[in-house]
Amino acid sequence: MAKNKFPGLGGGFNINQLQKQARKMQEEIEKLQEELNQREIEVSSGGGAVKVVINGKKEIKSIQILPEVVDPEDVETLQDLIVACVNEAIRKVDKMVEEEMQKVTGFGIPGLF
């Protein structure tokens, strides 16, 4: 009778089954990655003064700025609004990816995408 080469995994451990499950999970992750890359998230800051649209690949698709917040005497405020909006958009994409990965894998994989 052959000994189990992986103690602690029980006698019913099947490396082929594990490889099959790993391939299936990899396929599901790749499919999810493509789907997430197509999704877009819109975020605003300053009460809607600045809006950013970002996709799942963290590519900025558009930035909209209300004309009334463009003040040549106060460029710093506009810069702060844009930075805050872009950073929030990135955080939302990261959260979306993590939540969707948990659905597929049963656990999060930070920084996967």
From Swiss-Prot:
InterPro entries assigned to the protein according to its UniProt record, in alphabetical order: YbaB-like_sf, YbaB/EbfC
Location, primary (coarse class): cytoplasm
GO cellular component terms listed in the entry, alphabetical order: bacterial nucleoid; cytosol
Top-level taxon in the UniProt lineage: Bacteria
A GO molecular-function annotation: DNA binding
Listed SUPFAM superfamilies: YbaB-like (SSF82607)
Record keyword Cytoplasm present: yes
Keyword Cell cycle: no
Role: Binds to DNA and alters its conformation. May be involved in regulation of gene expression, nucleoid organization and DNA protection.
Family: Belongs to the YbaB/EbfC family.
Name of the featured protein: Nucleoid-associated protein Athe_1143
Origin species: Caldicellulosiruptor bescii (strain ATCC BAA-1888 / DSM 6725 / KCTC 15123 / Z-1320) (Anaerocellum thermophilum)
Lineage: Bacteria, Bacillati, Bacillota, Bacillota incertae sedis, Caldicellulosiruptorales
